[in-house]
Swiss-Prot record:
It comes from Vibrio cholerae serotype O1 (strain ATCC 39315 / El Tor Inaba N16961). Changing L135R: Increases affinity for c-di-GMP, increases amount of c-di-GMP dimer bound to the protein. Residues 12-24 have a biased composition (Polar residues). This is Cyclic di-GMP binding protein VCA0042. May act as a flagellar brake, regulating swimming and swarming in a bis-(3'-5') cyclic diguanylic acid (c-di-GMP)-dependent manner. Increasing levels of c-di-GMP lead to decreased motility (Potential). Binds bis-(3'-5') cyclic diguanylic acid (c-di-GMP) with a dissociation constant of 170 nM in the presence of 10 mM KCl and with 100 nM in its absence. Binds 1 to 2 c-di-GMP per subunit. Only 1 c-di-GMP is seen in the wild-type crystal, while 2 are seen in the mutant. Depending on the concentration of K(+) stoichiometries of 1:1, 1.43:1 and 2:1 are determined by isothermal titration calorimetry. GO terms for cellular component: bacterial-type flagellum basal body. GO terms for molecular function: cyclic-di-GMP binding. The keyword Nucleotide-binding applies. The keyword Nucleotide-binding applies. Dimer. InterPro entries: PilZ_domain, Split_barrel_FMN-bd, T3SS_YcgR_PilZN. Residues 1-24 are annotated as: Disordered.
Length: 252
């Protein structure tokens, strides 16, 4: 596995940021793709032979015989689809893996085939290697805790999916309010199974987002208050063999 100093890279919303890890590693594509969750969003950056650039997002389906990467056809206009999605065109692809320490996976791929029936999908080439940038200094612990997300005067449902001392990942219902990168939010996580009490809020700013059919998924980077409250929350959770849970769940 090769490593080199990290470069500035685009985050999931097209803004430039530097990964917190100091290296970008080159690993084989089989191991890299195993880090990408099915149905997660891929960002495709296409450059036509005449130099016109186009960026869109589309869900990742999976792989076929280790030769092709299968993706849904993006929801863009028919004109853009016809002009930018032509067999033989090259594109840069970016995926975010939320597992463990988190990673940004990026590689170059060629559009090989387009299938229209029975469902539209694109077949993309799989390179031998891919670049992986670690996003976090520390691992995040998987959990599944309900709560509320607060933004300005809005208060909506959320679910905390993983947590570390410096950040977390949470999801919201697909029809709920959409938050943008840079928004300052607070998560009030329920401290009892009935949802009548909450832990001190996890506060910080949205640093990335992904959307799917079932929910919107956000990465949150804590501020100082959020880091202190996250440390307190982690101290009150217990590991049940697969994920962190409330102490109350152990007794229920």
């Amino acid at each position: 596995m090769n490593s080199r100093p990290a470069e500035k890279i685009d985050n999931n919303d097209g803004q430039t940021e530097t990964p917190r890890s100091k290296t970008v590693s080159t690993i084989n594509s089989t191991d890299a793709l195993a880090m990408v969750e099915h149905s997660s969003e891929l960002t495709l950056s296409i450059t036509t032979p005449v130099g016109t650039k186009f960026v869109c997002r589309t869900p990742f389906i999976g792989t076929h015989t280790d030769k092709f990467l299968l993706v849904e056809m993006p929801k863009i206009s028919a004109d853009d689809l016809q002009y930018f999605f032509q067999e033989g065109f090259w594109m840069n692809i970016r995926a975010i893996s939320p597992r463990g320490e988190g990673a940004l996976i990026h590689f170059r791929s060629q559009l090989m085939h387009i299938l229209q029936e029975p469902v539209p999908m694109a077949f993309l080439s799989i390179p031998n290697t891919m670049q992986v940038s670690q996003l976090r200094k520390e691992p995040r612990f998987e959990l599944n805790l309900a709560g509320k997300v607060l933004f300005d005067e809005h208060r909506g449902d959320c679910e905390l999916r993983d947590l570390s001392r410096s950040g977390c990942r949470f999801i919201t219902p697909p029809l709920g309010k959409t938050y943008q990168v840079g928004d300052l939010v607070a998560l009030e996580i329920f401290s009892d199974l009935r949802g009548t009490k909450t832990f001190p809020p996890l506060t910080g700013k949205i640093c990335n987002l992904q959307r799917s059919l079932h929910h919107a998924r956000y990465g949150l980077e804590f501020n100082e208050e959020g880091r202190n409250n996250a440390k307190n929350l982690l101290a009150q959770l217990k590991f049940n063999g697969t994920k962190l849970t409330l102490n109350a769940e152990k007794k229920a």
